[in-house]
Curated annotation (Swiss-Prot):
Keywords: Membrane, Transmembrane, Transmembrane helix. The lineage of its organism: Bacteria, Pseudomonadati, Spirochaetota, Spirochaetia, Spirochaetales. The chain crosses the membrane at residues 19-41. This is Uncharacterized protein TP_0260. It is a single-pass membrane protein. Gene3D superfamilies: SH3 Domains. The keyword Transmembrane applies. InterPro entries: SH3-like_bac-type. Pfam families: SH3_3. It comes from the Bacteria. Its main location: membrane. Residues 105-181 form the SH3b domain. It is found in: Membrane. One of its GO terms (cellular component) is membrane.
Length: 448
């Protein structure tokens, strides 16, 4: 009975996660219980009337989304981990807020390109980050550090613990910073009259910007065709005054009146919550507030080839490999698992597979369908298998996946549960795998 109840609860939990209902469920759960702690704001949110040092009750910590869910003006709002310091008790939160009090409204911009942030308050400490000229940082507190010299001359300034707009922290010597109070002034802003001569902006306007994970897929040579399309990315829309961010699971539109440059690498879409920060020639970060009041940061990149070209090459690669593995006319047989044959257009027929249903192949799935190469295997599995064959049975609603290895005597398949897949990659084998051996029809079945 206890095991049955565990299975029921585990099944319900997995369904909440799969349906994207985990955060709403946690909100409902924690709305009736105590908070998980108190968050001290480390970077002001002027749009919400909040400043550094403000304390907010934290209801949920989501390690998956890397956000805290807090209450602001009687609304639940998501804030990224870096923007809050989570404390277990109100007393701890008050102590941390007191530490931030002296420089609560103090920010700074770098007057040098490449100004380093260091692990400690001394010029010989390891570097953790380099600031671009004009990049803004938050001053957290002043520290006692070693003097800094240029030749024999001691430079004026202090060591500050600072934070960048993406949460990176380090120690920075103030000689290379221009400090300002957020209540009185902002970093120098250049109006749009100068933007026509701005090389960074012209590069932004003349380039196509795609989700950062596109580049990761290209570098790893793991192109997930379901997560790549030319219509996803950042679209500045300069002529229409309408910027758009299109993602697989979300759409955002930002009507704006003009582009305003902030510092050396930041641009504000005036009239909207959208700002972009150019990291390098191929990367930028977009920061905005979504319809739920959550601060979001999305990164976008340029590519050497268009998504259409990348998709076409991947489709060609898969087609050639699949034809080599599942050659039309090939018939494979197993005494236990039936006969598997392939014909043109990646069509398969699998008869006599009753031993696999319903545990692996859904009941009523039928015996025909299409086979495809849709997934990849983790590097740790490449010594044992070549790849993944995915079977789409005509009367089933879910794909059935098998690791495969071509052998001199036929084909070896190993069933993979969909829970072992992440980002279209098989991460691990099952604890007790079901392994199938097939031989060409008329030949002896290969042995394990």
């Amino acid at each position: 009975m206890c095991y049955y109840r565990y299975v029921q609860v585990h099944s319900i939990w997995r369904r909440f996660c799969a349906l994207g209902l985990l955060v709403p469920f946690l909100l409902l759960l924690f709305s009736c219980t105590n908070t998980v702690g108190y968050g001290v704001l480390q970077w002001s949110l002027p749009d919400l009337g909040l400043s550094t040092g403000d304390i907010l009750p934290v209801y949920v910590r989501s390690n998956v989304s890397q956000v805290y869910i807090v209450e602001i003006q009687k609304k639940k709002v998501e804030l990224p981990f870096w923007q809050l310091k989570l404390c277990r008790t109100k007393k701890e939160a008050l102590q941390y807020a007191e530490r931030l009090r002296e420089y609560r409204y103090s920010y700074a911009t770098s007057v040098l390109d490449g100004l380093p942030l260091r692990e400690g308050p001394e010029n010989t400490a390891p570097q953790v980050y380099r600031l671009r000229e004009g990049q803004a940082v938050k001053l957290l507190w002043k520290g006692t550090g070693k003097a800094v010299y240029r030749g024999e001359n001691r430079l004026e300034g202090d060591w500050f613990k600072v934070m960048t707009e993406d949460g990176t922290t380090g120690w920075c010597f103030s000689h290379g910073l221009s400090l300002f109070d957020e209540r009185e002034s902002r970093p120098t802003v250049r109006e749009t009259d100068d933007l026509a001569r701005d090389r960074d902006l012209q590069h932004v306007l003349n380039s196509a910007w795609y989700p950062e994970y596109y580049r990761t897929m290209v570098e790893q040579r793991r192109i997930d065709l379901e997560k790549m399309a030319s219509g996803w990315g950042l679209f500045v829309g300069e002529k229409k005054g309408l910027a758009r961010i299109e993602l697989p699971d979300a759409h955002y539109a930002f009507p704006y009146s003009r582009l305003v440059k902030t510092g050396s690498n930041g641009y504000l879409f005036d009239g909207s919550s959208l700002s972009i920060y150019v990291r390098d020639a191929h990367t930028l970060a977009a920061q905005f507030t979504d319809e739920a009041g959550r601060l979001r940061i999305e990164r976008f990149v340029t590519l050497e080839k268009t998504p259409e070209e990348i998709i076409a090459e991947e489709q060609l690669r898969r087609s050639a490999l699949l034809e080599h593995v599942c050659t039309p006319g090939l018939r494979l047989h197993s005494e236990i698992y039936g006969t598997l044959s392939f014909t043109e257009r990646n069509v398969f027929t699998w008869t006599g597979a009753r031993a696999l249903s319903p545990a692996l192949i859904p009941a009523g799935a039928g015996s025909t369908g299409r086979v495809a190469l849709r997934c990849f295997i983790d590097q740790s599995l490449k010594s044992e298998y070549e790849g993944v064959l995915s079977f789409d049975f005509d009367s089933a609603q879910e794909w059935v996946h098998f690791l495969y290895l071509r052998t001199p005597g036929g084909l070896k398949l190993e069933h993979i549960d969909s829970t072992h897949l992440k980002d279209a990659t098989v991460l691990r084998r099952s604890v007790s795998p079901v392994v199938l051996y097939f031989a060409p029809e008329g030949h002896a079945e290969p042995q394990p």
